[in-house]
Amino acid sequence: MSEAIIAKKAEQVELIAEKMKAAASIVIVDSRGLTVDQDTVLRRSLRESGVEFKVIKNSILTRAAEKAGLDELKDVFVGPSAVAFSNEDVIAPAKVINDFTKTADALEIKGGAIEGAVSSKEEIQALATLPNREGMLSMLLSVLQAPVRNVAYAVKAVAENKEGAA
């Protein structure tokens, strides 16, 4: 192999390792058997969610995972592998891919990493069932508002009772 090719591959490994380190979540899938139309729809959905999706050779992924400190991912890099990286939303890649697997049997989640910790296929699928950040914030807000709302209703009821008695 020529020096130029080796240098290019080393650069790819370094780039992918940096993406793995910076990613809030990584989902690795086997996309073998997807039609071109399905692949296009999947990529568009991921892009709209702010997720980067790439098909990368397993040898490059293995070396990049080692550099990123995700050695346990090596077991997942068997057969064709595509990787979804998200730097902001931890749930987005898992949710989009899990939703897509319901319509496309060919797509299979192999594993991933969440906040730098290696995760199994089952953990990624469980993550996909959680609401996104905005959904979680609205749930938290409604939980925080409930006691205040209940006090307001109680005060209103007392005021109405006093008006009715007067």
UniProtKB/Swiss-Prot annotation:
Keyword Ribosomal protein present in the record's keywords: the answer is: yes
Q: What does this protein do?
A: Forms part of the ribosomal stalk, playing a central role in the interaction of the ribosome with GTP-bound translation factors.
Q: What cellular-component terms does GO give this entry?
A: large ribosomal subunit
Q: Kindly indicate whether the keyword Repeat belongs to this entry.
A: no
Q: Which residues form the signal peptide?
A: none
The organism's lineage? Bacteria, Bacillati, Bacillota, Bacilli, Lactobacillales
Which species is this record about? Streptococcus pyogenes serotype M1
Keywords noted in UniProt: Ribonucleoprotein, Ribosomal protein, RNA-binding, rRNA-binding
| UniProt gene name | rplJ
Record protein name field: Large ribosomal subunit protein uL10
Disulfide cysteine pairs (residue numbers): none
GO BP of this protein: translation
Xref: PROSITE patterns: RIBOSOMAL_L10
GO MF terms here are:
large ribosomal subunit rRNA binding; structural constituent of ribosome
Q: Which HAMAP family match?
A: Ribosomal_uL10
Subunit composition and interactions: Part of the ribosomal stalk of the 50S ribosomal subunit. The N-terminus interacts with L11 and the large rRNA to form the base of the stalk. The C-terminus forms an elongated spine to which L12 dimers bind in a sequential fashion forming a multimeric L10(L12)X complex.
Question: Known Pfam families for this protein?
Answer: Ribosomal_L10
Q: Which family does it belong to?
A: Belongs to the universal ribosomal protein uL10 family.
